[in-house]
Amino acid sequence: MTIKPSLTIDDIARELGVSKTTVSRAISGKGRISAATRERVQAYIEEHNYKPNASAKSLAESKTYNLAIVLPRDFIKLDIPFVRTAMSSIVDEAHTLGYNVMLCLDDDTDSTPLMRTLDYRKVDGVILTRTVEDDHMVEMLTKRGIPFATLGSLPLKYAGAAVVEADHDHIGGCCAFAKAVLTGSDAPIALLGNDLNYIVNQNRLSGFRKACQELVIPLNRTPIRMGINDLEGCREAVEELLAQGVRRFLCMDEDVCVRTMTVLRDNGLSIPGDAQVASFADTDQIRNAQPPVSALSFDSAELARAACREFIHALNDDSYDPKPLLGYKVRLRQSMI
């Protein structure tokens, strides 16, 4: 059989029913691929006298089939459930698609581990596990032309910088959950949150405000307190609100929620009898609290898998979704009456 001079990796992949990545690995001899598949590709190449052009060969040989996960150093200290779930899900998804994963710790003053990894070209791309308003990591990766994906949406000033931005519908979810909580009573309810430098907190706040606007609820019924980073800050905010007669609290994350419940009980208030709480984040700690806390549930594992999967598809020039947007579930439990 005479082969056309224009035979490409795409053609070979299509004829054999495998991905372009698999063909590239068979050509380069790099990456995870079964011996049987490698032999099948090589046999096809020999039969059709395929000679990869310089560009195709260079592309195949330059791939490392490694990804780097960038984890903020303070996340390790805080032992955040989202991080554990996301990391294990990324590793599993990457392994399924033939990639290995390297972990790089980062903080605002020292990006040495990742810089060294990039300098030695040990990875094909980077996955960032958080998005913030002013992100030195996004700026560095963009400047160096390194492809990256994010767990979470980027701020508008970085629009288009990431290859993939995977996120949950925080605005829609928080709006729906806030409506469910707000319509249950005419009593005021306070929103308590952490650092607004995190894009997820900005989106959750937007969802709450959208719910208040759509329900035409006056501002004095929904006081907002942000920047609650520790127990003492939470105590100050909650006790101030208690003095104003507020007995219902909607918390942006599980840490703020647990601290709020601690402060309420320290003040002699029972939940849900004397005060009520709800959370924009659902974790084991929230579900197993006494009483179980009403919460907005997001699938962190699926978010991480989607980000990794679409990113790898993009790196291999396959079709991909640049902005996967995942849904949510409203969980009403005993902490709200």
Predicted regions and their residues:
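N-terminal helix-turn-helix DNA-binding module of bacterial transcription factors
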Residues: 1-65
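Amphipathic helical "hinge" segments at domain boundaries
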Residues: 48-114
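Short beta-strand elements in bilobed, periplasmic/extracellular small-molecule ligand-binding domains
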Residues: 94-105, 209-233
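Periplasmic-binding protein-like
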Residues: 123-129, 188-193, 224, 244-255, ...
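Flexible loop/hinge segments that line or gate small-molecule binding clefts
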Residues: 129-175, 255, 281-293
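Hydrophobic alpha-helical segments within soluble ligand-binding/sensing domains
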Residues: 164-191, 209-210, 230-241, 257, ...
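An alpha-beta-alpha
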Residues: 175-215, 320-337
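Flexible loop/turn connectors
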Residues: 235-337
